[in-house]
Design a protein with these regions (language model features):
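Short beta-strand segments in beta-sandwich/barrel cores
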Residues: 55-56, 72-77, 93
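A short glycine-rich, His/Asp/Glu-containing loop-to-beta-strand
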Residues: 30-55, 66, 116
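Sec/Tat signal peptide C-region and signal peptidase I cleavage site
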Residues: 19-23
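Short acidic-glycine-tyrosine-enriched beta hairpin
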Residues: 81-98
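Bacterial N-terminal signal peptides
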Residues: 7-18
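Glycine- and acidic-residue-biased ligand/ion/polar-headgroup-sensing regions
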Residues: 61-80
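Ligand-binding loop in jelly-roll beta-barrel domains
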Residues: 71, 98-119
Length: 120
């Protein structure tokens, strides 16, 4: 009885963690904002558009490179609930270490970026 109860607990925890991991993929949590334009064993390239005021739910990225097509102001909130305001400039290109966050376009126009997620 104890063995089956422990097995059920472990299985339940694994299912919850697997669901949480899947839910944090930006393409899965916000498919209308994230379009996969290329994916292979080394990278996944996302074409990302957030309309003015639009918020993307909590999601995670591996190490990635962001190229800004149309910049704007954003507010990101990390897992600890700490907000960070930032302004992205047109043509800016930055490296971002792996992170989990929610992000909102706080500007009055659409924000458009290309996000290259590194797999290796």
């Amino acid at each position: 009885m104890k063995t089956s109860m422990a097995a059920a607990t472990v299985l339940g925890a694994c299912l919850l963690l697997a669901g949480k991991a899947n839910a944090q993929d930006p393409v899965k949590v916000a498919p209308t904002m994230n379009k996969v334009v290329l994916e292979n064993e080394r990278v996944r390239v996302l074409d990302v558009t957030l309309k003015a005021g639009q918020q993307m739910p909590m999601h995670q990225h591996p190490d990635n490179i962001v190229y800004v097509i149309k910049g704007g102001k954003t507010r990101a909130v990390n897992l600890q609930g700490v907000p960070t305001d930032r302004e992205f400039k047109d043509g800016e290109c930055t490296f971002r270490p792996a992170e989990t966050h929610a992000i909102q376009n706080t500007d009055t126009h659409d924000l458009h970026v290309i996000n290259v997620e590194l797999k290796k």
